[in-house]
Amino acid sequence: TCVKEIIEAMPDVDILVTPGGGGGLLSGTCLGAHYFKPGLKVYAGEPEGAADAVLSIQSGKVEKAPFVNTIADGLLTTLSERTLEIIQAHVSDILLVSEDEIKAALRLVYERMKIIIEPSCAVPLAAVLKNADLFKRCF
């Protein structure tokens, strides 16, 4: 229901960015976007140190990251066959971010909002900041 609620609160939204991880939130976001607002683009942020989703998209089958090294440990789960299928059909792109970019996003949220968030939650923001040209309408 989160996609439905976002669309109701912001009817003009045209892009959503979520963390990658095991693909549950990402695939659910994709399906919700496809159902409630066809044409709504969904992107995923993924740590470079746990890039199994990017590898899986490239190979067309569920892959494990060749190495795992990230502060965003909430995203260490692997895609399933079903989530990969949904992501292949509906995700606009998976955007890789470095550890430094994740830490910079964490710092930005703390400095601006005075809240501490989990590193995995900072990954989508890091992806947006790194790819500002892709999201220029958002700034």
State where each predicted segment sits.
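PLP-dependent amino-acid enzyme catalytic core
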Residues: 1-139
